[in-house]
Regions:
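Non-catalytic terminal extensions that flank enzyme cores
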Residues: 1-93, 231, 249-250, 261-275, ...
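NTP-handling and nucleic-acid-processing catalytic cores
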Residues: 3, 45-59, 179-411, 417, ...
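Conserved oxyanion/phosphate-binding beta-strand-loop segments in alpha/beta enzyme cores
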Residues: 39-84, 113-122, 146-153, 334-377, ...
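Residue patterns forming the tRNA-binding/recognition surfaces of aminoacyl-tRNA synthetases
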Residues: 46, 59-63, 67, 138-296, ...
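N-terminal catalytic cores of NTP/NDP-binding nucleotidyl/phosphoryl-transfer enzymes
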Residues: 71-141, 172-185, 300-301, 368-404, ...
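Glycine-rich phosphate/pyrophosphate-binding loops
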Residues: 109-132, 310, 354, 358-441, ...
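Acidic, turn-prone loop/beta-hairpin segments
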Residues: 126, 503-507, 514, 644, ...
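Long, charged, mostly alpha-helical binding arms that flank functional sites
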Residues: 130, 277-279, 422-466, 470, ...
């Protein structure tokens, strides 16, 4: 066995002390630092996690240090971290999704506090909106009263899951002190021409009786909230001109790479929808020779397919359609029915006597099929706000067009004008590109133009597109253009429970902004018939509130009765947390800053996150951000959220009756044997699956019931351990027993350690507990016993792994739990014999546990230090949550020295022939291994470098072979065999 080198550890304290028996000393811990359990050494008490919750939650609630208000995030020397979870709608009940997101944010927040950061971790309430209004109507109460009651309930529920928020910064979007500034931001946008009112065809929810943004209508045309079939109406609405920021919103996504999930970035890019193509002009006319027709512009990203156009399709509200409907009863009937069809419907109506002329016939007289008159259809799949409400149909090269054409024309053949191979490659003739319709499949890739394409035959798609558009441009039939999917943000809602739009309508002056000094425009108190279920907007009938004077001329005027979309509130709330008591402005300019880590569901990838980016970029150009008021001076793009954690959903265990598919109540299933559930009464085995939690599936789980049964610590740890943050969490309550067993082992470990430390009179200065990453330091690794060496190495590796995960890869928080379980098992199976190593290992384990399971960590910390006495205490002992995060214990050399005990034998082959066997140190194990098989590049290099240090390795790899000319190195069987190929 090679001798362990005498390696000194890096000093961990300003005055590091050598601990030698019997000189271990500790001060008596102040009584206000730890609650003493008894005057004698305790026996291991039975672990009661629920009782620990009650004790420590009550203590934290009274602890001024835990709730001390910070006047502002000032220019202190501490690094600052802003950790924020997406604030909830106050429904009155926490669900498992809430528990997951707030546990994640709480762990990260507590971690950075222990790392010495000035951490902002606030909580607020997304309190406006339809759910609160509808719930209040159902109950006959004021939405403000109902919301306030729910907030109080949810605050208590959050306290019971041991999450620590900066409650002194709490806000609710329905508070006039908050929405005063929402209205101010509206006026800032209005002043810049970015808030405007316009007549528009809008999405109207007939159940909730309000307008919806495009993003709030699903792919099948249903409301995201009520589930009602959305209607299309022409109404005057308020918009934010988000399209003015479209280039910035797209370009700056690149700066978020690495900080945001690629999936979310892709979703935003797709929603912004920048595309390059051409605007092509078709002439549409009635069949008579007297009708010269009108120009209809279509946008296409594939002008190379123009020779394959078989029809034009118009939107339901296109002017040509509207005019034709005046004299076509069947068309009017189709339009009535089509408004309820899904956007992907293949239904169509061919306009009688209306045809289109192909623009290419003006420049290509040899392709006779271009002279055909093209039918013109009305189709629900054509969006009125895409291009100009018209599209060209190319069945041979678009799957949707193919399906529509077959449905409405029933053609015998389909023409292909693009082929994957050049025309001359295999002698393709024009006849070869006309395919029977029943056999035809759309070819949607780039390729080469076929003989049907006249003078463009044989050109590649990209070249043909350029040439065709250029030729049509000369006769003013086409031009290259850029289009976006993004539309301006419709923000007005015809409901009561929202921030009133601060505009007054005057008969003489038109719309006039409310003066800033008159903000907030408060909601009037409602009562009477509306609270009994009357539909519509009560602001329209609140006479005293509605009628006012014009701020401009002083004449009679009316307030705008629309309220703002709740996404306006959430587009800036994170900035208000920075300065929640500011009466003069939304926030002080010197406090403006982005969120460091933002946690929330991927379902907000388009709506909330896109709107928040827009508003932040707008505000960054205002006087509220004076340091970066000029975008040209920005060193980095103005983005509100530097790192985004998108957690997966929580699915619940679902039981269904096999023969009927009926969802079963949990009370209908006998789970005496969890692995073999049976339906009560029939004793039939139900189908078991994990699905999104919902009342209809009877698979919802109340997190407060879990914490009442198992304790908050076990519930939190189980939530983290069950799945990586980004993945769906399949909640299985039966498996929480594994977490309970781990915490019980840890509990016993702490009591055993406390007794052993007391027996050897181990002492520690209480002031040292908050001075560095460790209260004591190890002077040397020489002479460590096997159990001490294993313990100190395992502790060191766990500290490195857990710290790296939370800092650099918080999506892997499940591995943090597994790392702590492994360390607990190592210390339990072979307890360290050295008091110093024992204390270092146990205290480090508890500090790493503190963000995850705060109550048992606090109690265990108290137990561990109970009998560590120092007769002259110099400072109160901090709680574990105020103690520093543990730092690395060993250097790389020390890790190698400890790992080398005994060594490992490696067989070395050269070109497949065994040449020698060498002994090298054990490779330091990484506590959390990367996914996949085999060694990482770093591990391979470590093994090779150790082989080259041996005498045999030098002879065979350097002297007898030229190591520099090696072709490859293959390492297998965990490093036991190395094959070098020269």
């Amino acid at each position: 066995m090679p001798a362990i080198l005498q390696l000194r550890l890096t000093t961990l304290l300003p005055q590091a002390r050598r601990f030698t028996r019997p000189a271990f000393r500790l001060p008596i811990l102040p009584s206000n630092a730890f609650i003493r359990l008894s005057s004698t050494l305790p026996a291991a008490r039975k672990l009661d996690l629920v009782d620990l919750d009650k004790k420590w939650q009550a203590k934290w609630q009274l602890d001024a240090a835990m709730t001390q208000a910070k006047a502002e995030l000032g220019p202190e020397s501490k690094p600052k971290s802003y950790i924020l979870s997406m604030f909830p709608y106050p429904s009155g009940t926490l669900h498992m999704g809430h528990l997951r997101v707030y546990t994640i944010s709480d762990v990260i927040s507590r971690f950075y506090k222990m790392r010495g950061h000035d951490v902002l971790h606030p909580m607020g309430w997304d309190a406006f909106g339809l759910p609160a209004e509808n719930a209040a109507i159902e109950r006959g109460v004021d939405p403000a009263v109902w919301t306030e009651q729910n907030i109080a309930k949810m605050k208590e529920q959050l306290r019971k899951v041991s999450v620590e928020f900066d409650w002194d910064r709490e806000l609710a979007t329905c508070d006039p002190d908050f929405y005063e500034h929402t209205q101010w931001i509206f006026l800032m946008l209005y002043k810049k021409g970015l808030a405007y009112q316009a007549e528009a065809l809008v999405n109207y929810d007939p159940v909730d009786k309000t307008v919806l943004a495009n993003e709030q209508v699903d792919a099948n045309g249903f409301s995201w909230r009520s589930g009602a079939k959305v209607e299309k109406l022409n109404l005057k609405q308020w918009f934010f001109r988000i399209t003015a920021f479209k280039e910035m919103l797209l370009k700056d996504l690149d700066s978020l790479t690495g900080g945001w999930p690629e999936r979310v970035l892709s979703m935003q890019r797709n929603w912004l929808g920048k595309s390059h193509g051409a605007r092509v002009t078709f002439t549409v006319a009635a069949g008579s020779q007297d009708d010269k027709g009108v120009n209809v512009n279509v946008f296409t990203t594939r002008p190379d397919t123009l020779y394959g156009v078989e029809y034009l399709a118009l939107s339901l509200d296109h002017p040509i359609v509207t005019k034709a409907a005046q004299n076509d009863l069947a068309l009017r009937k189709f339009l009535d029915e089509a408004s309820s069809l899904p956007p992907d419907s293949k239904a169509g109506y061919c306009l009688n006597g209306i045809v289109a002329s192909h623009p290419l016939q003006s420049i290509d007289s040899t392709s006779h099929h271009l002279t055909r008159k093209l039918p013109v259809f009305v189709a629900p799949y054509v969006l009125s706000d895409y291009g100009e409400g018209a599209v060209m149909g190319v069945p041979g090269h678009d799957s949707r067009d193919m399906a529509f054409f077959k449905e409405n024309v029933n053609p015998e053949t389909i023409s292909l004008v693009i082929q994957p191979e050049p025309v001359n490659a295999r002698g393709i003739e024009a006849a070869d590109t006309v395919i029977p319709a029943r056999e035809a499949k759309a070819f949607t890739q780039d390729g080469f133009l076929t003989p049907l394409c006249g003078k463009y035959k044989g050109l590649h798609s990209k070249d043909a597109a350029q040439k065709i558009v250029a030729d049509l441009e000369e006769i003013k039939k086409a031009e290259f253009v850029e289009t976006w999917r993004l539309r301006d943000w419709l923000i007005s809602r015809q409901r009561y429970w929202g921030a009133p739009i601060p505009i007054i309508h005057c008969g003489d002056c038109g719309p006039v902004p409310v003066p800033v000094e008159d903000l907030p425009v408060k909601l009037p108190k409602i009562e009477g018939e509306w609270l009994k279920g009357k539909k519509g907007n009560p602001l329209e009938s609140s006479e005293k509130w509605l009628h006012t004077k014009c701020p401009s001329c002083g004449g009679p005027a009316k307030r705008d009765t629309d309220t703002m979309d709740t996404f306006v509130d959430s587009s800036w709330y994170y900035l208000r947390f920075l300065d929640p008591a500011n009466k003069e402005s939304p926030f002080s300019s010197h406090l403006a800053r982005p969120v460091n880590v933002y946690i929330g569901g991927v379902e907000h990838a388009i709506l909330h996150l896109l709107y928040a980016r827009f508003i932040y970029k707008f505000l960054a150009q205002s006087d509220l951000f004076p340091a970066i008021a000029n975008p040209e001076n920005l060193k980095v793009p103005a983005e509100p959220f530097q790192t985004l954690l998108s957690q997966g959903m929580v699915h619940g265990k679902t039981f269904t009756e096999p023969s009927t598919g009926r969802f079963l109540l949990p009370t209908e299933v006998d789970i005496t044997s969890p692995d073999k559930p049976l339906i009560k009464g029939t004793q039939v085995t139900p189908n078991v699956s994990f699905e999104k939690m919902s009342k209809s599936k009877h698979n919802g789980v109340d997190p407060t019931l879990c914490t009442a049964k198992y304790g908050a610590d076990a519930t939190r740890a189980h939530v983290l351990f069950s799945a990586p943050v980004s993945e769906v969490l399949e909640w299985d309550e039966a498996k929480i027993v594994g977490i309970e067993r781990w915490l019980s082992r840890l509990w016993k470990l702490v009591f055993d350690a406390q007794r052993n430390l007391a027996d050897c009179s181990f002492t520690i200065q209480s002031a040292d507990l908050d001075s560095a990453g460790h209260a004591v330091s190890l002077s040397s690794v020489q002479g460590l016993s096997d159990s001490d060496a294993d313990a100190i190495l395992a502790t060191h590796n766990t500290i490195v792994s857990v710290t790296t995960c939370i800092e650099s890869n918080p999506y892997g928080l499940n591995t943090v739990i597994s790392d702590l379980i492994k360390l607990t098992n190592t210390l339990s199976s072979a307890p360290p014999s050295s008091p110093l190593v024992l204390y270092l290992s146990i205290s480090s384990l508890l500090r790493m546990l503190a963000p995850i399971a705060p109550a048992i960590a606090s109690e265990s910390w108290e137990v561990l230090h109970e009998s560590l006495k120092d007769p002259t205490p110099s400072a109160p002992t901090p709680s574990i949550h105020a103690s520093p995060w543990p730092t690395s214990i060993l250097t790389n050399e020390q890790c190698d020295a400890i790992s080398a005990r005994g060594g490992q034998t490696v067989a070395v082959q050269i070109n497949g022939k065994l040449r020698c066997a060498v002994t090298i140190p054990h490779m330091p194990e990484k506590t959390t291994t990367p996914q996949g098989k085999g060694q990482t590049q770093e591990e391979q290099e470590w093994i090779i470098s150790r082989i080259l240090e041996t005498a045999e390795g030098k002879v065979w790899l350097q002297e007898k072979n030229d190591w520099g000319k090696r072709k490859r190195v293959i390492i297998v069987k965990g490093g036991k065999l190395v094959n070098v190929v020269f």
